[in-house]
Structure formats: C-alpha cells, structure tokens
Amino acid sequence: MSEISYLSINNAHNGIIIKIPKPVRFHTLSEFKKYIQQSYSIDSVDNLFLLTTFGIKLNYNLINEIGEVFVYDKRLFTNIVDQSLIDQYTQSTFRVSEPTHSPLLKSNVGFLKQNLSSNLKINQGWARIITQDGELMDQYCRELIQQINVIFKCLNTIFQFATNFTNEIEKNFSNFFNYVKLINYKTLHKSWITNYKNLKTFPTFKIDNENIKLSDFLEVDRLQSSADYIEKFLPLIVNKLNELKQVIETVNEEKLTVDKFIETSRNESISNFKNVNISNVLSQLQTESQQLTDDIENLHYKNMDEIYRLHRDKLSISIYNNAKDIYKNLNDLQQFKNKLTKASLKAFNTIANLQMKMVGVKTEMKKITTEDETATEDSKVGDVNYKTISNVKKYEDYLSLTIDLPLIFGFSLIEKRRQFEWYDFYSKGIVNNVSEQLSTIIEHEKVFRGIWLKKFGTLLSLINDDPLTPSLPNIDVTLVGNRQNNFSILYDLKIERDDIINYISLIEATNMSKNFVTLLNKNFKDLIASTNNMKKVTKVISSLSTYTTNSADDKSKSSHEEGTEEEIDFDLNLIKGLKSRIKKLENLLHQQQFKNLNNWPVIRNVPSMTNDNRQSTIIQPTVVSPARTNPTQLLSRNPSTTKENTTTNIHNNHQQSEVLDSSVIDKHLDNIRLKKLNNELQTKNTELTNQINSKNETITQQQKEMEHMKLKTEKRVDELMKKLQEKDEECQSLKQENKIKCDEVENLTKKLELSDNHNKELEAKITEYTQKATSKTKEIADLNKTVSNLRSELGDAMHMKNDLLSNLSSKEAEFTKERNQFNNDLKALQLKLDEINEDYENLMELTQAKQKKHDLIINDLNNVIINLMNDIKKTLLSVFEYFLEYCLVLESMGLLLVKEDEIYKIKRVKGLKSKKSIGDGDMSIISNGTPSSKVIEEIENEINIVNNIPPISSILPDSYSSGTESDSVVDRYNDQSMKLISTFNQLFKFNNENENENRIDHILNTLAFKNNVQLQEDSINDTRFFLNAISKRFRDVEGFAKRQAKDNKLKEQEHRKLVHRLNSKISVNGFQEKDLVLFLPTRIDRPNGENIPSNDKIQPWAAFNIGAPHYFLKTEQTKNKEWIIGRVKKITEYKVTEENVQSLESNPFQLSVNVTWYLVEADEE
C-alpha cells in the first residue's frame, strides 16, 4: 500500500503548519486561498501572498508536484501595522500554569504515622500532576521549536523571492549601464574636429577615372549637430543611470540588512537554546516521579520516616526544579518567538519597499530600453527615453566615421569586387554549365531508354498491353534577379583588384592606424579565397557528364585501376570533360544521320532470303539486336570505336547492299520511320479496341454478379431479421424472469436496433449476442442467488424492525411521562423568571441612578484633567520660552548649544556674536533675537506634541455643572472620555524604547538638561548645565580682562621709554612736529651763476635729511654758527609756480618751478 503524501501550508508569522493530503481537493486557486483564509482567520483573500520553495510564486497547476506552500499576510508588509493584528499573531495558544512547590514543604506533620502516609499520598498526587504538566510543556516546547524553524524558513523564502526579483532587474540594468558607460568612455563629441581634420589630410585618389576625397562623404553641419546633441543628452543619460544605480545600491544595502537580521536572529536562537535538552529533563522528572510512586506502594511503618524525609528534602525539590526548568524553557521559547515575529515585521516592510524601488527601476529601464510609439522625441527637457539613447548611439556612430571611414571605404571596395567576381565571372558560368551538363545527362538517359525499349519492349507488350512510353524531366536552370549595380557610396564605379591594392598601399603610406592595413589585407585575402572556391566549383560542375559516358570496358578498367589511382586532379577532369563534350557533339551529329539504323528493313534487299526466314519473322517479330556495348556508348569519349561498332553493325545487316549517299539515306530513313510509326499506331489501336471490348465484357459480368450478390444479401438480411426477432423474444423472456437487468436488456435492444444499419456485420454481431446471452444467463443466475440472500437479510431486518417498534413504543411512553414532568418544571421556572425580571428592573433603576452619578463624576474629572493638561501645556511653553532666553544669553556671550552623539554640549563659537550683531542689529535687545542653535528645532518638534491638547472650550459640554445635566449631555461623556484617554495616551503613555519615561517626562528631562549633557568644567559647587557654562565663560572673560590690563601696563611703560628715547634722537626724514632736526647752512644756486654777497641775502638753513631736500629753517640771520639743532614747532608747505618764481617772498630760496618746499619753525635746543 503506497504512503500518503501531504502538502504542508506554513504560516510565516506564527509558524503554524497545516497539512493537506494529496491530491489536493481544491480545483481552483480561489478555493485554495479561501481554505487558507478560513484556517488562519485572515480577513480577506486579497491579503494572502503565497510562495513555494526557493522563493518562487505559487503555480497552482503544479500544486500536487510541490511539497510546501508559504503563506504571508500582506497587511504586515506596510509601514504602519495595526497592534491588534500583531497581537493576533503573537498570542499564545498554550495554557500552562507555573509549577508549585510540594505540599510536604508547607505541611506541619506530627509524629502520627497516619499523617505521614496521607501527606505522602498527597505529595504523590502533586508529583503526578507536575509530571503530566511537564509532558504537556515538553510537547508545547517541541511545537514552539517547530514554529520558530518554520518562521526562519519563511524568512529565507521571502528573502530568496526578493533576491530573485531584484537580481533579474539588476542584471538587465548592469548590462545596459555598461553599454552606456562604454559609449560615454569612447564618446567623440569633443574630439571629432581633430579626427575630421586628419581625415581631410587623407590624399585624393582615383578609381575608374573618378577623383574621390573621403572627407567629402561627411557633412560638417551634421557632424556638429550630432556632437551638440550628444553633449546635451549624454550627461543626462549618465546621470539618469547613476541615479538608478544609487537606488539599486540602496536596495542591495537593504537586502544585506535583511540577510544580516535573519543571520543574527538564527545565531541568537542557536546561542540561547543550543544547551537546552528538554527531553533529558523530562526523563529525569518522570524517573523521580516513578521512584516516588514506587516508594509509596512499598510503604512500611519501619521506613516511613526515611521515605518522608527523602521525598521532602530531595525528590520533591528535584521534581519541582526540573518542572521549573521546563516551564522556563517554554517561556523563553515563547518570548523568542514573539520577539522574532515582531522583529520580522521590519524585514517584511524592507522587502516590500525594496521591491517597490526595483519596480520603479524596472519601469524606468523599460522606458529607456524599449521604444514607445506614443512618446515624442525630447518631449521634456531632461527627459531620457529610448529615442534619446538610440539617437545618441546613431550620432556617435556617425562621429566615428571621422576615424573609421578609410577602413569602411576599403571594406566596401573589396566587397563590391567580390560580388562582381561572384556574379559576373562565376555565377553565370556555373548556371550555364549546370544547364548544359544536366541536359547532356538527360540525353544519355533518353538514348539508353530508347535502345532498351527496342530490345525488350515488344516482349513485355505481349504480357501487358499497356504501352511503355519513356518520359524524362525537362531542365531549365536560369539565374533570377538582376545584379546590384548601385553599391552604397561607390555607386556604379567599376572596381578592379589593382584599385584595392593601390588603396591599401595608400593607407599604409599615410598616418592611419596600422590595424586598418591588417584588416584590409585579411579581407582582400578572403576575396581571393572566395573566388578560388568558386573556380573549384565550376571545374567540378563542368565535368559532371563524364560520369555517365563511361562504357563497360571503361568501368571495368576504372574498377581495376581503382586500387592504384586514388585521386583525380580537377584540372585533368576538366580536360576530360571538355573532350567528352566535343565527342558528344560529334556523336550527336552522327546519330542524326544514322538514326534508327538498326531497324532499317534490309531484308527486302537480300535476294537469298528463304521462306523459312519469312516464317521465322512471322513467328518471331523483328527485335532490335542487342548492342554489343553499353547504349551510352553513342556518347563515349572515343569516336573511332563508335564508328567501328556502327560500321560493323551495318555490315552484318547489309551484306549485299551498296554504299548509299547520305541524303538518299536520310530520305529513306524518314520514310521507314513514318511507316514504322503508322504500323505501331495501327497495332496499338487494335490492341486498345480489344482491351475496351474485354473490359466491357468484364463490366457486364460484374453487374450480373452484383445483382446476384444483392439477392443473396437480401435473403441473408431476411434470415438475420428472423433470427433477430427470435433474439428479441428471448430478451423479453429474460426481462420477465429478472426485472433487475431491465436496463441492460434495453441497451441490448437499442444495440440490436442500431445493427440494422450494418448489414454486413450482422452475422458476427449475432454470434456476439449469443455469447452475451449465455453470459447474461450466468449473471442472472448469480443475481438470483444474491436476490435470495437479500430476501433472507430482508426477513431478518423485518424481525429487527418489529423489535425496534416495540422498544420505540415503550420509549414513547417514558418520554410522555418525562414531557409532562418537564412542562411542570417549565411553569415553575417561568414563575421564577418573572420574579427575577422584576428584581432586574428594580436593579436597573438603581444602577441607572448610580451610573448617572458616575457619569457626572467622570465629567467633573474630565474637566479637572483638561484644566490640568492645559496648565501643563502653558507650563511647558513657558519653560520653553525660558530655554530660548538661556540660548539667547549664551549666544550673546559667544556660546552655542549643540548636540553631538546624543550628548548636549555648549561650545565657544568664534564670530557668532558678530554674526548676531550683523543679523539682528542691536545686541542689547536679546529677547527679540532668534537663537542659532539647531537643538531648538529638535526640542520644538518634540514640544509640539502638547499642541494636541485641546482647549477647554473644545471638549467641555456647553453647560457643565456637577448635578443638573440632561440625559443627552450625559451620553456625550463617553466620547469626551475617549478623546481625553487618547490625548492622555499620546502624552503620558510609556514608549517602547524606554519603559520608565513617557513623552512629557522626556520633554521635561530634556529641558532640565541633567542627563546626556557635557559640562564645561567639573565643579562640585556648580553642576547646572547652563549656569556651569555661563560661569565658566565669565571666569574666562575675567581672566582675559586681567591679562589685557597687565599687558596694557607693560605696553604703556614701553611707550614712555620709546618716546623718551625718540625725543633725544635727530630725525632725517618724514619730519613732523616735535621732531628734533639738525639744520646746516647751505647756498643758493643763482640762475645766472652770480653769487650775491651773503650780507644782502638770507642765509638758508636746510634740514639734514635723507630724501627730503627742501626743508628750510625759518629764522633770522644767525652768524658764527656751523649748525643748529631745533625742535619742530610748525611745518608750512609752499610750491613754486611761474607767477611767484621771481618773488623773493614766495620763493626766497630761488627754487625751480613746480618744486614743493617746506618752511620749518623750530625752537633751538
């Protein structure tokens, strides 16, 4: 008996397995999904997602060929999952109570033996219960382990599905990306100008008296427009593909995170449960429980105390510990399963997101790789589609012609020459040779068949009157299609091999790539090889007819020499073929002259012919004597042998004839041919008439036979009909004997009625019917036996029926008694129900009053809560305002609040104060500024949660008091409470990350700045965050001010020293007031070289200087002094002009025009 195979349905979220026997009874996929939906309690069939092994989508046509199906709930793949749905999958179905301690540890036992024995038996029952719970927990643990393994298997399957989905798209993208990358790497839109200039330097050459310049084939405007188009759209294409590549890289990173999550979860499960062996613990528990039972069964008064101590101090504790371990393992497995189920939601969401991203990539790839007829080229600026990329490729190819045009032109020259040689030189020759050779072969066959018919045709006509008319096929080999004259850029130029050689040498002489020369030479060698191959084909075809002209002697000779000569040279075959063609033409000419010479009636010209010979000719018709050689000898290579054979035949048939002239012979031969044809036609006509008469006779005979057969068949049909009626009667008798087989007999009658249409098969069918009738009689006999058995069984059943009826009557009497009793009880219960309804109504009135009071209290509490929540909102906003003031104070001092690595810090930022002064104007108004810290935005986003608190007017009733609400207002309390509860949960519910902190606490802790902060300095006296930073800043500023004051004092002292030193030093340039200057007497250069006595003029005193020559001392006449040292009091500037150049007041020192001089007033020291 074959084993039953099952289809396993695995739930990916709770690990539950459902097994269905094969073949699956569901005919369609919708029915199968409906069954899964009902089994796993999923809302809708549309939420199901089914996969098979290796992440392949389910193909329901192969449902009986697969072993596992993995079920996923699509609702768990979304970004936000309903908590009730998560609870549905994480809800535990195992109900096991925690093991309790032994009752022996709790009881106070005296010295009575009876108490000991009863406590031991109670402990035995406790151990039995613990053991049963342990076995149940062991079973639950096995189920949990199986479910966890199923969840891991489902995670691997969905990951394989995502990997398969993304890999295919990524592979297509990589191929296309490499293609575009290659275009971008080899683009010519920037370097085509230099390539085109190099192409223009290529020299002009001549082919077929035509001067050709390669650069003329390219249009400069088209090249420029192509380059512009590529320059515009190629960066857009590359950027588009780079964006898609970044998306694919993010998808791969997300795949790695999912894979890492699965791997870490599996490693965690291995590390947590690899040392757990529940079966050993359970076996130990069962062994100890069995030992405890055995001890109680063998209990005696002598060893009761020892057994009691053993059970209390050792066995009971060990049993409890083992049960506790099993219970702990069960809880650990359940917690790990719930944790894995919740953590896998992120993996499912990641897989759904990456799948959507890859769908977007696939859509973009379809847009740029497949042509869309509805899309217009460059429909939008920056839009990249298939048309754009194909245009870039086309334009790049056109730009590449600036480099590859010499090579492509050379390929075109070689190809056109190859086609010319193939078509003109050889294809026509091959066609003509084939036609001629095939017609020659047909002529050989025609001659052979004519000679053979002359030899054996008359003898065969005696056996069969059908004429033997030889028919041979006609051969018409023609070359269809015109030669291509216009060959692309070469047009109708005639290309010679010398032109190709000259062109290759021209390229070799220029600065073109050496690879061009190599490729062109290789292509030219291929041209020569193609032409040589066509020559060989032509040689072979021209010698085809030689294989049908060999005589018998030639065949024997060739077979004899076959061992010595293994190969025949093609050139020799060609020569032999040409010779045979010449001989064939000679033979055809000779054959036309002496055609049918063997049938020439030479008997008339022989006088010595006797009657016996005539008698023999009547008895034996004239038969052409068989040729001594092969009939194809008429076309043999040696014409001399052919002539000898024909002359010997003529000599044997015409021993006494004279040599005739050729023209007379031809006429005579024509007459003979016509007479012979007439005789043949007459004989054929008589034969055909005889055949027609004989066939008419056969037709009449066959008609008579058909009538006779018809009569026979009618008689036979009558007989069969009689037999059929007899069989019908037999069938009716069979029907009367057994009504059970009436359906089969009706089928037989129908078959018999249908047999009227098959007259030729009636006899065979009747024999079959007789055999069936005999078999049916046997079956009827068997059925009669079964009927008798059934009748006996029916009698037994009737007896049983009577017994059951008697029992039923007695039961009915009992039921009537019970019914009466139940009616009485029902009346009593109805009375009690009425009393309970009255009590219930009274109770409902009381509860309604209490409920109304509770509703009023709830309303008051709601009002209190909303007031408190609004006060909390105001408090938080005011605290936030204080926080802003702190930040503004910090920034006014050059400090900035920042958050680095989840830690708040206050840093000194250079230039912050100047920036604030530039942006805000007056730094004195701190409150009007806006802080620059980015932490404020983060805290402001967190504190915006308090905006969800509704104002007092939005949630309180229109008129609220503590005891005068109407019923309609009371009905609104529930909605108000639900709104407050939802708002309260948003603010004060503990989050998952920190079980001990809600959102309001988090905001307050953040604004307190006590945790996750870094102080500016460690101080025992000051640990407040802002105060610590401000005090440190003040101390830094105070220290800086002290250092500056000290530095200023030192600099003032140095300044005094320098001033004192400078006051005692003589200045030599850059004269200013209070400078000490040395004046020396100097002379005045007169314009005419005259020297005026010094007594008449002022003696000039010039300042001793470096680079400042026109500083003169304003003083009276000083005599008997060689130098004067004075401190400058005032410096007056003057300038000599053309007006005052002669004035002694304005130009006392007679300086030149446009000279600037200074008059210095100084006190002599």
Swiss-Prot record:
Task performed by this protein: Plays an essential role in both non-selective and selective autophagy such as mitophagy. Recruits mitochondria for their selective degradation via autophagy (mitophagy) during starvation, through its interaction with ATG32. Works as scaffold proteins that recruit ATG proteins to the pre-autophagosome (PAS), the site of vesicle/autophagosome formation. Required for ATG9 anterograde transport from the mitochondria to the PAS.
Organism: Candida albicans (strain SC5314 / ATCC MYA-2876) (Yeast)
Family listed: Belongs to the ATG11 family.
Domain of life: Eukaryota
Presence of the UniProt keyword Membrane in the record: yes
Alphabetical GO biological process terms: autophagosome assembly; autophagy of mitochondrion; cellular response to nitrogen starvation; DNA damage response; mitophagy; pexophagy; piecemeal microautophagy of the nucleus; protein transport
GO molecular function: molecular adaptor activity; protein kinase binding
The encoding gene: ATG11
Main location: membrane
UniProt name for this protein: Autophagy-related protein 11
Listed InterPro entries: ATG11, Atg11_C, ATG17-like_dom
Entry keyword Membrane: yes
Keywords: Autophagy, Coiled coil, Membrane, Protein transport, Transport
Regions annotated as coiled coil: 239-304, 670-853
GO cellular component assignments: Atg1/ULK1 kinase complex; phagophore assembly site membrane
Subcellular location: Preautophagosomal structure membrane
Induction: Induced during biofilm formation.
Membrane topology designation: Peripheral membrane protein
Quaternary structure (record): Homodimer and potential homooligomers.
